[in-house]
Amino acid sequence: MGAIPSVLFFLLLLRVPESPRWLVKNGREDEAGAVLIRVDTAEAAAKEIRDIKDTLTLGEGSIRELFRPALRRPLLIAIVLAVFQQVTGINAILYYAPRIFEDAGFARMSAIGQSTIVGLVNMLFTVVAIVLADRVGRRPLLLIATGGMGVSLVLLGAAFRFPVLPASALLLIILLYIAFFASAMGPLVWVVMAEIFPIKVRGSAMGLATLILWLADFAVTLTFPVISDKFHPSTAFWLYAAMCACDLVFIWFFLPETKGKSLEEIERSWLKTA
């Protein structure tokens, strides 16, 4: 069963074209134009190829270049987004879902079944994010979803602190939280982190941001059971809700919208604000 998704991914990958940037870099401009024309006009495709050529002349960047004035802001945005993706509690809930459901009153086998439902909702709403990201925009989706996550976590903490709701209601609150996360913070953080960096330094920048993201994940995974045992599960959930509030403020004031902008346009915007 575990091999089925891998096989499907492999088969679908066979139909994915090479990126226009890679094709141009390797002297295959006609193929790059054909790929771009599938999603835009011939005129726009030609302009995009010219922009790609301009960026390719810059060469490869190093980690040291990430700390230049023009790149400090996108680097800070990527790092903060990476941290917020984790400290808003997603992997505490995913990793410890069976324990959370047992604490909520589900039998052990039933708790494992609820964890399966959580995974299914996570997958379905990731598809929603894919559909809406280029229609609605990154910022609106992230703002709405982060607010929804915060409200869900407040309700979840209250449900644990004041156990008057049936276990099924608690399950619905968790599924609501998962749906909000999967529709924005889950996939779109990776999208935004990739989009805001110039091509020259993207590899180094994404590597650094990813390292910090998983360090934050490690911290959350390590501290959730400690907080739950020493204080109360509601304390952890309310702490994650507070992180959602901080994330909302950060997105509102500092995150630019990247919808509809080419990578080259985004790069030029950083140069203007440096």
Enumerate the predicted regions with their spans.
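Short, well-structured alpha-helical segments
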Residues: A45-D54
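Alpha-helical transmembrane bundle of multi-pass membrane proteins
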Residues: M1-E31, I37, L56-A274
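Short helix/loop segments within enzyme catalytic domains
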Residues: V39-T41
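Charge-rich, low-complexity intrinsically disordered segments
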Residues: A34-V35, A45
